[in-house]
C-alpha cells in the first residue's frame, strides 16, 4: 500500500527546488507528494500537522537550513525544542542554505555559459554569496534559480555539496554508481 509523502520546507526557494527537482523522482513511490512551506505557519499548527501525518501512517521529510549553527546536531536540537512532535529520523539539514544546493548543480560548462565561477564546493555558500553571484543579465534571483534548475546536474551537485550528497543517498533520489 502506497502512502503520502509530505516534504516540509522553510520557504519559497525550497518549494521551487523540491517541486522541480525532488518531487518528480519521489512521486512513483507514493500516492502523492506534497510540499508544505512551514516557516510562516505557527509552531503549534506545524506540531499538530506532524502528529497527524504520523498517525495516518504517512511519511514526511522535514527540511531545514543549518544557517549559522555550529553542527547538524545543534540544528536538530533547536528543531526538537521548537517542534515537539518531530521525528529525528525525518530531519534533513541543508548545509549551508538551499541556495548552496541550487549552485551545486551547476556544471562547469553551464557556469562558463552563465559567466559565473565554477565552485568546487558549495558547502559554505550562503544566501548572500549566492545573491552576489547572480549575473546582471537576470531580472531577479528567481529567474536565475529557474535557469539553474533547467540544467541542474544531480551528479555535479552530489560532488559539490556534502549535505545534498547525503540527502540523495539517504532517500535514493538519484542513482549514481559513484555514490
Language-model segments: residues:
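C-terminal accessory helical subdomains adjacent to catalytic cores in phosphodiester-
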Residues: 1-2, 15-36, 44-61, 66-179
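Conserved beta-strand elements of the Class I
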Residues: 4-8
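Acidic donor-binding loop at a coil-to-helix junction in glycosyltransferase catalytic cores
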Residues: 9-13
Amino acid at each position: 500500500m502506497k502512502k503520502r509523502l509530505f516534504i516540509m520546507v522553510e520557504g519559497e526557494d525550497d518549494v521551487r527546488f523540491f517541486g522541480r527537482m525532488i518531487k518528480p523522482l519521489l512521486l512513483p513511490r507514493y500516492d502523492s507528494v506534497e510540499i508544505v512551506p512551514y516557516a510562516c505557519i505557527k509552531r503549534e499548527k506545524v506540531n499538530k500537522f506532524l502528529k497527524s501525518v504520523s498517525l495516518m501512517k504517512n511519511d514526511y521529510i522535514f527540511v531545514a537550513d543549518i544557517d549559522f549553527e555550529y553542527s547538524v546536531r545543534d540544528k536538530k536540537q533547536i528543531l526538537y525544542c521548537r517542534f515537539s512532535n518531530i521525528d529525528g529520523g525525518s530531519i534533513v539539514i541543508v548545509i549551508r542554505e538551499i541556495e548552496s544546493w541550487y549552485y551545486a548543480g551547476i556544471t562547469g560548462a553551464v557556469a562558463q555559459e552563465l559567466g559565473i565561477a565554477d565552485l568546487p564546493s558549495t558547502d559554505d555558500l550562503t544566501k548572500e554569496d549566492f545573491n552576489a553571484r547572480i549575473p546582471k543579465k537576470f531580472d531577479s534571483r528567481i529567474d536565475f534559480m529557474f535557469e539553474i534548475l533547467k540544467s541542474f546536474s544531480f551528479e555535479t551537485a552530489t560532488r559539490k555539496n556534502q549535505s545534498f550528497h547525503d540527502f540523495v543517498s539517504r532517500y535514493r533520489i538519484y542513482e549514481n554508481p559513484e555514490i
